């Protein structure tokens, strides 16, 4: 049996980041960012989803980001790719329902920025960290994948769970007030001390 036909769980976790204003980045850099963060997921899903549909069983888990719930200065294209991941996941979930293949499940995971590694140095101010604290380790994300997505079947768990407040704020606040709140908790300045990729790749 081909591995494409026998896979039960696919976790799409490829990701990279370029920071800075969008117009300051090269076309090549932005294309690479889009390919790694989004387009690659389309190809892996197309490779393994047919086998899951055939047996009407399987779970595809796509790693998105907290930036899929709100924009972020100096992360415009990164955030856009993560919004795309969330939209792809939601749309495919509906597609398999229409196909009568509800045994194939889809989840998107939305972790806030990791304090170490790719987003080291990224931080909000004190108020912002209360509302949207950073993720301490990859293990915290892994536990959410296993416990909330795989075991409980959550469609789009946030990491940490308090990040659901961001979704609530977006739904309740008018745009003009949401901009002020974003400034108040330090969203505009969160990339000022970024150290994750100091070479600017």
Which residue stretches match the model-derived regions?
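Residue(s) in the substrate-gating loop at a strand-loop-helix junction
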Residues: 65
């Amino acid at each position: 049996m081909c591995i494409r036909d026998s896979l039960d769980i696919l976790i799409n976790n490829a990701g990279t980041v370029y920071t800075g204003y969008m117009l300051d980045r090269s076309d090549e850099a932005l294309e690479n960012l889009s390919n790694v963060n989004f387009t690659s997921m389309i190809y892996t899903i197309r490779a393994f989803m047919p086998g899951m549909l055939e047996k009407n069983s399987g779970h595809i888990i796509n790693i998105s980001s907290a930036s899929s719930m709100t924009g972020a200065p100096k992360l415009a294209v990164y955030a856009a790719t993560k919004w795309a991941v969330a939209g792809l996941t939601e749309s495919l979930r509906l597609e398999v329902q229409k196909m009568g293949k509800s045994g194939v499940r889809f989840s998107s995971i939305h972790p806030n920025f990791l304090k170490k590694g790719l987003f080291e140095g990224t931080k909000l101010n004190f108020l912002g960290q209360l509302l949207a604290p950073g993720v301490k380790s990859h293990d915290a994300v892994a536990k959410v994948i296993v416990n909330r997505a795989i075991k409980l079947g959550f469609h789009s768990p946030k990491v940490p769970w308090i990040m659901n407040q961001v979704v609530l704020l977006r739904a309740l606040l008018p745009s003009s007030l949401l901009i002020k709140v974003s400034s108040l908790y330090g969203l505009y300045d969160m990339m000022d001390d970024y150290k994750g990729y100091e070479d600017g790749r």
